[in-house]
Amino acid sequence: MAYHTPFAAQPPVASSGLPLTLISLDDWALVTLTGADRVKYLQGQVTADIDALSADQHVLCAHCDAKGKMWSNLRLFYRGEGLAFIERRSLLDNQLSELKKYAVFSKVVIEPQPDAVLIGVAGSQAKTALAEIFTELPSAEHPVTQMGNSTLLHFSLPAERFLLVTDTEQAQQLVEKLAGRAQFNDSKQWLALDIEAGFPIIDAANSAQFIPQATNIQALNGISFTKGCYTGQEMVARAKYRGANKRALYWLAGNASRVPAAGEDLEWQLGENWRRTGTVLSAIQLNDGTVWVQAVLNNDLAADSVLRVRDDALGTLAIQPLPYSLAEDK
């Protein structure tokens, strides 16, 4: 079987019923940072403590504007001798132009890697399948491994899965090895798993709209409140210490006559009436017809609240439990 992407689209499946699946991640992009000042420069730009990031760890963090609003979130890790991050392709160009603004004063080269191949490996026996190709795999304790031109990331949520950053040759080997055993799917399957995991999806429609805490990045250990200065730090800190953040990321599931687009609002039932509320970050329809919506809503919303896609008289959406706690450390 020849390797080419994107893989043919299939209706996404929830993690509990997902067979072994290779997923082409064409909706995501890879960026690398190299040069002597790569760590120092990024330390002044993102919410995570880059000085504390080890070579066997990855972190989801935010890149903010001066008002603390996220240009994007980034899945950040070491790759080879440099740093790398993965973000949604829809906002790549704009986010990079912001990130590079002051790079001319530092010894750092920031560039997209359009030839890099991003493949997700998820579902039943994902670890066993990868072990046939790679002698060392990442784990929950050590979620990043490097082998030659390949970097492997491990994710525990919503169920064990892996993200492979590699080249075309290695991708071809993986496809050939697992053809006949694995399903193939496109980016929407990985998107569904991220929604189920409660990982915020920031696309171009929602860039520079939310502080990181409105999308639960603090609950995913993506914000350091003890590191030095970075762009937007004052607003991010104020949200924590002055209780300025009144929003949170939610996972909703139910039925809908259409899949809402990023940036749309939803409707919340109040007695006999419906009130517009919140912002959709991402949404997907599964193989069983269920619609999943990831949205930013008021953080005091009752767990039994009923919502729906805007103007959808026949649909209802219910709040689903996230696989992590939003309780703040005191």
From Swiss-Prot:
The keyword DNA-binding does not apply. One of its GO terms (cellular component) is cytoplasm. Keywords: Cytoplasm, Folate-binding, tRNA processing. Signal peptide: none annotated. One of its GO terms (molecular function) is folic acid binding. The keyword Kinase does not apply. Its main location: cytoplasm. GO terms for biological process: iron-sulfur cluster assembly; RNA modification; tRNA processing. It is found in: Cytoplasm. Pfam families: YgfZ_barrel (PF21130). Belongs to the tRNA-modifying YgfZ family. This is tRNA-modifying protein YgfZ.
